[in-house]
Amino acid sequence: TDMSGMFQAAISFNQDISSWNTAAVVNMDQMFMNAYVFNQDINTNGNSWNTSSVTSMEYMFFNAFAFNGNITSWNTASVTGMYRMFEDANQGVPSSSFNQDISSWNTAAVTSMERMFFNAFAFNQDISPWNTTAVISMANMFNGATSFNQPLTHNGNSWNLANVTNMTNMFTGATAFSTANYDIFLYSQANNVATNSNITINVSSNYSDATSRTYLTGTKSWNITDLGNTASVAPT
């Protein structure tokens, strides 16, 4: 039931473990933490590991620089913790490789996405369909994720931030995050009645939707630090 730390610091491990029966496993925390070269397909004949019982994946691929396996079809319905799951703590030396489609993951039970993609330089996938209703912390979620540039709105519906209390440095250093996608984020949250109040968020982008931003900083009492309105940016 417990695979936590199983290959932690196994710096040379890169074997095929695709056929494992993981149906009863509850804890995968730190499983491949600092497993620098591991990059195996965790599938058997097209079938991925059974992760339906897993409740925690915190630090699972922390500093697993080489890993870029297909984990698209994982069942994450029971997972509550994804804290620092794909974090590259060494700031890209070497850089994190993970950039797989995980848009279909069921994240309805997840309470922490803090530092999930911290310094995950390669990651740039659409995760707008995720259910974030239970999430409490998104602090540093994309901090240093220099490739990430996706809208966090799916079929006109924004992420539900009703229970989020901490978004500090969420997009700090996410330098690819465009004004267009930042505007989408501002607009969708300003027009979502579920959006929580008194949020602090840092974004390394300019905005052009001053109306939505003003609503969030005023009516919702958000404390937003960003690169300013594009209208005030001097041409180069």
Where are the predicted features?
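Negatively charged
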Residues: 1-236
